[in-house]
Amino acid sequence: MKKFSCGFEVTKEVIGGKWKGLVLYFLMNGPKRTSELKRIIPNITQKMLIQTLRELEASGLVSRKMYNQVPPKVEYSSTELGESLKPILQELCQWGGYYAEQEYAEGEYEIVQPEQLS
């Protein structure tokens, strides 16, 4: 059993890293296929996207639904536990926008639509 000094450490362990929060954030708007997530998050590699989805699934934050059809179809969605993070992720998103506008950021950050990233 891992031991932590506060709940923030547990949160960071579960949703920390470069992509987990972002993938979760976009799944909060409804189920997505990997190709849809890849379009929304163009800077993530296919391998890293699959790894991130598997880790989020193992943590109980994301569910994977496989359809019995040809070609195979797989959708990912946030679970009830994952949805409990929605207000937190929305607040982090708002704070990021606020920070990007501050003088400390010195024009280093610009919030754009996903299609403008590729």
From Swiss-Prot:
Domain HTH hxlR-type: 6-104
Residue intervals passing through the bilayer: none
Keywords on record: DNA-binding, Transcription, Transcription regulation
PROSITE patterns: HTH_HXLR (PS51118)
Pfam families: HxlR
Provenance organism: Bacillus subtilis (strain 168)
Keyword Ligase listed: no
GO molecular function: DNA binding
InterPro entries: HTH_HxlR, WH-like_DNA-bd_sf, WH_DNA-bd_sf
Organism domain of life: Bacteria
Source organism phylogeny: Bacteria, Bacillati, Bacillota, Bacilli, Bacillales
SUPFAM superfamilies, per database record: Winged helix' DNA-binding domain (SSF46785)
Name of the protein in its database record: Uncharacterized HTH-type transcriptional regulator YkvN
